[in-house]
Amino acid sequence: NLKKVNKKILTMSENQDETDKGEYKHFMFKEIVEQPYTVKNCIDEYVDSIKKNINILNFPIEPKNINKIVLIGCGTAYNSCLTAKYWFEELTSIDVEIDIASEFRYRKLKFNSNNLYIFVSQSGETADTAAALDICKKNNVKTCSIVNVIESTIARNSDWVLPIHAGIEIGVASTKAFLGQLTVLYILCLKLAFVRKDIE
């Protein structure tokens, strides 16, 4: 149709040096060794140790009004959601539900504007998770994504993004990303517990 299209240019945040195995024989071993740095990156990003404060701000819903948290993911991300469910139930007064994204897509769901739907994905491009997010957007509910790639589709389509800062991960076992997801979910859980006065 000869219409001019203005495309938005995104600069990728990854450091290409991370694609080198360096002194390690396998990427998986290298990434296991890098796990503590992932946790440190998350703590540095979200925790102010001097002021003793958790710097998670700009909630899409007033924390005290959150009725339920729905955690959605596939594979490794789903497993991190399973673990986080125990933390939210133990530390907060918020009801928690977990869904595998591929099943969430095809269920007859009742959406609530006071529910927070959290999508967990390393790449931010997981097809089923992205499709589940689209369903939530069409139903005008608030969404959050916990991803490693902040330029990804899931991150861009969410109301709120919490990066896990794991860096490039090549090993299929998803060692760094899993630990990063758990760390961010736990910090988020603590923040909600403090804000809602569930713990002092």
Regions picked out by a protein language model, each given a short descriptive name:
Residues 1-64, 77, 86, 90-92, ...:
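N-terminal segments that mediate ammonia production and transfer
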Residues 64-198:
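Glycine-rich phosphate-binding loops that contact phosphosugars or nucleotide phosphates
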